[in-house]
Amino acid sequence: MKGIILAGGSGTRLYPITRGVSKQLLPVYDKPMIYYPLSVLMLAGIRDILVITAPEDNASFKRLLGDGSDFGISISYAVQPSPDGLAQAFIIGEEFIGNDNVCLVLGDNIFYGQSFTQTLKQAAAQTHGATVFAYQVKNPERFGVVEFNENFRAVSIEEKPQRPKSDWAVTGLYFYDNRAVEFAKQLKPSARGELEISDLNRMYLEDGSLSVQILGRGFAWLDTGTHESLHEAASFVQTVQNIQNLHIACLEEIAWRNGWLSDEKLEELARTMAKNQYGQYLLRLLKK
């Protein structure tokens, strides 16, 4: 399975902060925002990853992440010339995806929860259809919304409806079989001129191959698209890390625990950051 991180967009809701820098490069406590969605792909066992950025930000992402070898993965890059919809990622990434299945994660989404790694690996193991994740929110009109019947089976999906049929939002994490590329090519722009991911999900729903997994108690899904939510996300990460004495979305640790980095490579990377808490945390891992 291949992985795609969509890190484009103009971040207008975060102006003036994002006038000079990509939203996905902003810090969320002690790491760049993009570390969090990248960690999701790595926890799912995905090592071949495409990062799609706005044209003006591509070089900055390359400078931060490189070719991925420091994290035991392979990272390539592409650009989205203009923010024409999430589903456009599959058209941009068609050659990268090839004949593989694909997982798309949005560059400004943060996930945390018990047994999340197991949940991800189960979704990645599916060879047919699509898997998306639903989470209860206070403001469903801001998101794609999934409606369930009395048996809690998905019956409809709408993108940012004025009158939501439920308070279950579809999160920014999607697993698809290889048909996603051809399905995306069939989409027509919505009223707001975008290729909507909800329309793609609806195609899977209509042919009976969409699985909607619930992220319930014990899970946190954080959308960092506003000043308030960005601050809340940083506070959440700080609190969890301080209480549990672990780091969320520590890419080097994930790679090391997955067997993708040797002890020697982890120590080498940690030494370059030994003067801060992040590097010291990596060094402590080697002593346990």
Swiss-Prot record:
Organism superkingdom: Bacteria
Cofactor(s) in the UniProt record: Mg(2+)
Pfam families: NTP_transferase (PF00483)
GO molecular function annotation: glucose-1-phosphate thymidylyltransferase activity; metal ion binding
Residues that, per the record, bind Mg(2+): D108, D223
Description of how the protein assembles with itself and partners: Homotetramer.
Function: Catalyzes the formation of dTDP-glucose, from dTTP and glucose 1-phosphate, as well as its pyrophosphorolysis.
NCBIfam families, alphabetized: rmlA
Family according to the record: Belongs to the glucose-1-phosphate thymidylyltransferase family.
Name the UniProt record assigns to this protein: Glucose-1-phosphate thymidylyltransferase
Naturally occurring in which organism (per UniProt): Neisseria meningitidis serogroup A / serotype 4A (strain DSM 15465 / Z2491)
